[in-house]
């Protein structure tokens, strides 16, 4: 006993030293505190296993509410400071800022990133719901705050689902916390803004409504899910599978899946091509299985070995592990609930684009709600077969795995990441000089800040239409833009294009390496 106590004290000392080092890394310029954080998590876990630490008695529901508010505030801070420090992008934050601004200005869902009707790329009529906010506070910050609040509001839904299934308020609060700690959720939140991710809270509350017998509310939430993006229909098909397999509501499940499939078919076959003037472009990611939705479905049914050979890769295995580990692999014990994730998982795993099967991208929005529900169901089955301590141990493992896999988020709190440096401040001074009505072609980091206008492009796209350019001269020569040249003689600047065209500009403003040009 004395030896265990001595070891516990030694681990306490190590944890204290790591904590001090972590605080130092947060204030040190350009340090990455995530490694120290992982070490601290592992040491505290080992310390708890050796001699359990006292856990204060807290009201589970109040804890969930506080955690929900804290998540919304923390991630609003992270995403806003990332944006202010030029770490957001034209695609997709700038794109959606421009779309919603155009809608709020009476121009309809138009964009110039690329220049087209927005519904010709992705069909997201849910964006109309954000228009009133843009009448009051237009801009990127509005979208980032809405996204953080939306994700946070999924936690109370998880609490209600878990309390109903587990009949344990404490475990329900742990699952709500587990949801908020999920690395996929956090990854989606910091990757600019995407209307598709609103599916996460919408589906979680649809589960709550379905289990409470609130059919009309459930249907409304599913309609909003369908409105988030055309391929969100896959999540609603999955919801239908869950109704049928998990709740034995065969007719309701079949009807839900059938309606969702019809919407997906109509959107990709007729609606989006009508706005685009050509076939639905995103099916190109599945060229190995055919050129249409029907071809892909037939490949799954008729050539399963070919499909398996395509998806049996190391990257996809890592993706599966990264999605399951933060939930303690509990979803594997909830097969009926996990079945709902299959349509969206198929979309991700069959794609030739690796971004779809990366666990921190927005493409997990259609998968994560089902994994969380399946984890709760898996915990309920585990409690029925094993002692309560065993189930709580699995949840504790899931929390540790979530903290480790989310450790990179701690880097966002390092002072150099959120406190603007001299270059960031110079950029904002130059961006303030861009005329509000100017047609602008700018390098990527500037675009999301300047998207409240009809025409904004990512340089050198749109240079023939733009009357202003905004460039970061320290990045010249532009290795990713072969053939695009820049020559300067005093206040005169010439931009040369690969096809021989030359555009002449005058310097409108410059601060450090941030250069604003006005066409002569």
Kindly give the residue locations of the regions a language model identified.
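Membrane-lumen/periplasm interface segments of specific transmembrane helices
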Residues: 78, 92, 102-103, 249-333, ...
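Transmembrane-helix motifs of polytopic, lipid-linked glycan transferases
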Residues: 142-166, 205
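Start-transfer (signal-anchor) and selected internal transmembrane alpha helices
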Residues: 2-76, 163, 249-252
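Short helix- or helix-capping micro-motifs
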Residues: 172-183, 222, 226
